[in-house]
Amino acid sequence: MINRTHASDVGPEDDGETVEVSGWAHEIRDLGGITFIVIRDRGGSIQATFKEDRSPELFEKAQQVGKEDVVTVTGEVEESGQAPGDRELVPENLEIVSEAESPLPLDVSKDIDSDLSTRLDNRFMDLRQPEVHSVFSLRSHLMESMEEWFDENGY
C-alpha cells in the first residue's frame, strides 16, 4: 500500500519505501536528460528526480510542470547526499493536480523584494514564503499555549 505523507515526514529511515507526496512545485531545474523538481508542502520539501533514460514518459510529463503547480508524485525514497534533506524520490508516477497562473505575481522560491501593494494583492502567494508563514505559525502556537495555560489555571 502506498503511504501518502508530508515531505517533512520522509526521512532516511524510509529508504526503499514507496510514498506519495503532494505539494507545490517549488523549484524546477532542467539539466538536459535529468529534471529535478523540489516539491514543497506545509511541512517541508523533497526533491523528485526525473531521468529521461529511466522513464521517457515521466520525463516528458515533468517537462510540463510549471513553478507553483500543484503536483502529486509517487515514488521510492532514496538516500542521496546531494539532494536537499539527504533524500529524494525516484518517481513512479506524476500527476499535475492544478496548474498555476503564469507569470506568477510573486516568486516564492527566490528572495525578490516586492512592494507592499503587490504583496497584499497577492497575499495567498506571499504567505507561502517561509519567513512570512513562520510569523503566523509562531503566533498560532503562542495563542494556543496561552489558551491552554488559562484553561489549566481556571481562567
Segments the model singles out, each with a brief description of its role:
Residues M1-Y155:
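Class II aminoacyl-tRNA synthetase catalytic cores and aaRS-like
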